[in-house]
Amino acid sequence: MNLKRLFTTEGVKGKKDYLDSQKKYEIIRTVIFFGISIALFVAGFVTTGDRNNLLTIVAVLGCLPASKSMVGAIMYCRQSSLAKEDADKIESHTKDLTCLYDMVFTTREKIYPVLHMAVCGNNIAGYMPMKKAPKNPKKALSENACAEHLDTCLKVDNYKDVTIKIFTDLGKYITRLSQLQELTTEDKHTEGICNTLKSIAL
């Protein structure tokens, strides 16, 4: 177990199976945080015989980061990594492309699980699989809305004129990957764009 992952996802975000592996760290951290608060409350009550003491205040304040951690754990538990069979199909078409896995982007209204992305200069392609059609059409994930959200975030970091295409169909996504492999484009923005994408992802 990498204890560093209890407090940071640096170096692992964007890697294959990131979402599935990070879940346990989020849950463990949440349990530890709540455990500390409970231990402080019990210690204060045992030593003073009364719950109205300084340690109770500290325990209550400790529930704030614990609750925040719990929200994060719930977010991770609701997501899953890219299916192995899909990953195998995709990886046969990503030679020389810079790729990111398990990128979940959030807005106030939507959650966009883009489980694979390829970045080639100022070109981005992403695969957002549709598990099943929602009962309410308004809750359906929109490839265009996701692309617009990412474009807005990239412009904040001065990455303009970026072509972003998000696909819910695996076949069309693989076709786009093949097209990206044939592009002759400057690679100078790839690393910076990847860093921005990772910074705004779950």
Task: Go through each PLM region and give its residues.
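Surface-exposed interaction regions that form or flank ligand-binding interfaces
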Residues: M1-L100, T107, N144, E148-K155, ...
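Acidic, Ser/Thr-rich low-complexity segments on the non-lumenal side of membrane proteins
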Residues: K95-A133
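Short C-terminal domain-edge/linker segments immediately following a structured domain
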Residues: M130-P134, N158-D161
